[in-house]
Swiss-Prot record:
The keyword Secreted applies. Keywords: Amphibian defense peptide, Antibiotic, Antimicrobial, Secreted. One of its GO terms (cellular component) is extracellular region. It comes from Uperoleia inundata (Floodplain toadlet). It is found in: Secreted. This is Uperin-2.5. The lineage of its organism: Eukaryota, Metazoa, Chordata, Craniata, Vertebrata.
Amino acid sequence: GIVDFAKGVLGKIKNVLGI
């Protein structure tokens, strides 16, 4: 769903930022 998609995007961003 939309929520799962948003969580996936946030996870990718966090990985890129090294958080």
